[in-house]
């Protein structure tokens, strides 16, 4: 059973947002391979995520045997999230929702961004239907202590498109299963917390 307090949720959602927003740098990958994240992995394994964490660990071990590991992981990221919608699992709600649903999502997301005065780095050029924006809003709702709003946001806005997104991620073959395991962790946490 997954039991997380608010601080743990915020930390884990932030970690997932960072991993799923952009490719890991060579330095970040080295931190993973050097065990900097071992305490987090151990904690998540205790939260009924052992299978997914084992996949992450095995992927990191597999990468440690490659001379340009960070480039291989970047290629996995690109193949999974950056190609066209036929070949990638695009991390945008617009790739999975009907036009009507998307318009409702965008209106609500934009309302929350304004309400919580959240601004994003415009150099990233991510529209408000990007996964990172949704996760940042979830983190903000968690920080505000609004458990019911967080739950409703997860149920009605995140899972509405993340379940088909994750199904597509799982079907795409890459050198490692690192990102497939990460998206499984996200879906499992959202479904069980």
Swiss-Prot record:
Main location per the UniProt record: cytoplasm
Pfam families: Nitrate_red_del
Keyword flag Cytoplasm: yes
Keyword S-adenosyl-L-methionine listed: no
Cellular component terms per the entry's GO annotation: cytoplasm
Origin superkingdom: Bacteria
GO biological process, one term: protein folding
Keywords: Chaperone, Cytoplasm
Compartments where located: Cytoplasm
InterPro entries reported in the protein's UniProt record: Chaperone_TorD, DMSO/NO3_reduct_chaperone, HscB_C_sf, TorD-like_sf, TorD/DmsD_chaperones
Family to which the UniProt record says this protein belongs: Belongs to the TorD/DmsD family. TorD subfamily.
Entries under PANTHER family matching the protein: CHAPERONE PROTEIN TORD, CHAPERONE PROTEIN YCDY
Cross-referenced HAMAP family: TorD (MF_01150)
Function of the protein: Involved in the biogenesis of TorA. Acts on TorA before the insertion of the molybdenum cofactor and, as a result, probably favors a conformation of the apoenzyme that is competent for acquiring the cofactor.
Annotated protein name in UniProt: Chaperone protein TorD
Organism from which the protein derives: Histophilus somni (strain 129Pt)
């Amino acid at each position: 059973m997954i039991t997380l307090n608010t601080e743990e949720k915020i930390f884990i959602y932030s970690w997932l947002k960072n991993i799923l927003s952009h490719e890991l740098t060579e330095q970040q990958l080295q931190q993973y391979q050097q065990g900097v994240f071992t305490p987090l992995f151990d904690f998540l394994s205790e939260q009924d995520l052992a299978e997914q964490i084992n996949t992450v660990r095995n992927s990191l071990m597999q990468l440690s045997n490659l001379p340009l590991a960070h480039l291989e992981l970047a290629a996995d990221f690109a193949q999974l999230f950056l190609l066209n919608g036929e070949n990638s699992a695009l991390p945008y709600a617009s790739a999975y929702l009907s036009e009507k649903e998307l318009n409702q999502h965008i209106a609500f997301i934009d309302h929350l961004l304004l309400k919580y005065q959240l601004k994003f780095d415009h150099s990233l050029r991510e529209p408000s239907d990007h996964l990172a924006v949704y996760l940042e809003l979830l983190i903000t709702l968690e920080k505000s202590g609004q458990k019911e709003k967080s739950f409703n946001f997860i149920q009605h806005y995140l899972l509405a498109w993340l379940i088909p997104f994750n199904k597509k991620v799982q079907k795409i073959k890459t050198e490692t299963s690192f990102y497939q395991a990460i998206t499984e962790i996200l879906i499992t946490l959202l479904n069980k917390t």
